[in-house]
């Protein structure tokens, strides 16, 4: 229905952003809302209009390729929008594609809500069907053009990041496990999220 929305970021929260376009605020759920910063510069968000009997929502992405993988993940039995967003938020979408092609279930079960059965279903449904998804085109959500020290964070930024992790489906025990490491840093909300996701995925085996 919508290819993309252009406008200005009016609100950034743990689960979604609000984009103002001609006086209308669009609530758009994204993998990591904090990659979108409030500014006077107009941005473009590629969208997916999700409609079911009990829900209608807009999901947004920085690239068409990111959106493409999201839609393919939704086609897998056992994966809903929240699970697909958690996979994309990891910043390892290229590795997800590689894991599917190489039938690496151990990597796939690292994500919240993905057990062995769902991982196997992802492989069965998507292996050999991701040729149009180019990993190099994905935004690496762990990388940043700024040094982590360029903007000092605070407890507010850390709290926002932890809320974002919970919104993605990570259990409280998992979130608590990475807090000591995050407390050693002084980062922005976006950087805290990237750091936490890196710790969570690298720590799961």
From Swiss-Prot:
SUPFAM superfamilies: DNA helicase RuvA subunit, C-terminal domain, Nucleic acid-binding proteins, RuvA domain 2-like
Keyword DNA damage applies: yes
Region annotated Domain I, chain positions: 1-62
Stretch list, region Domain II: 63-141
Gene Ontology CC entries for this record: cytoplasm; Holliday junction helicase complex; Holliday junction resolvase complex
Chief localization: cytoplasm
UniProt-listed InterPro entries: DNA_helicase_Holl-junc_RuvA_I, Hlx-hairpin-Hlx_DNA-bd_motif, NA-bd_OB-fold, RuvA, RuvA_2-like, RuvA_C, RuvA_C_sf
Region called Flexible linker, residue ranges: 142-152
A Gene Ontology molecular function term of the record: ATP binding
UniProt keyword Membrane present: no
CDD domains: UBA_RuvA_C
Pfam families in the cross-refs: HHH_5, RuvA_C, RuvA_N
Any one GO BP annotation for this protein: DNA recombination
Cellular localisation: Cytoplasm
Domain of life: Bacteria
SMART domains: HhH1
Keywords of this entry: Cytoplasm, DNA damage, DNA recombination, DNA repair, DNA-binding
Region of interest: Domain III: 153-205
Subunit-structure text: Homotetramer. Forms an RuvA(8)-RuvB(12)-Holliday junction (HJ) complex. HJ DNA is sandwiched between 2 RuvA tetramers; dsDNA enters through RuvA and exits via RuvB. An RuvB hexamer assembles on each DNA strand where it exits the tetramer. Each RuvB hexamer is contacted by two RuvA subunits (via domain III) on 2 adjacent RuvB subunits; this complex drives branch migration. In the full resolvosome a probable DNA-RuvA(4)-RuvB(12)-RuvC(2) complex forms which resolves the HJ.
Xref: HAMAP family: DNA_HJ_migration_RuvA
Entry remark concerning the domains of this protein: Has three domains with a flexible linker between the domains II and III and assumes an 'L' shape. Domain III is highly mobile and contacts RuvB.
Job of this protein: The RuvA-RuvB-RuvC complex processes Holliday junction (HJ) DNA during genetic recombination and DNA repair, while the RuvA-RuvB complex plays an important role in the rescue of blocked DNA replication forks via replication fork reversal (RFR). RuvA specifically binds to HJ cruciform DNA, conferring on it an open structure. The RuvB hexamer acts as an ATP-dependent pump, pulling dsDNA into and through the RuvAB complex. HJ branch migration allows RuvC to scan DNA until it finds its consensus sequence, where it cleaves and resolves the cruciform DNA.
Family listed: Belongs to the RuvA family.
The name this protein goes by in its record: Holliday junction branch migration complex subunit RuvA
Lineage: Bacteria, Bacillati, Bacillota, Bacilli, Bacillales
Gene that encodes the chain: ruvA
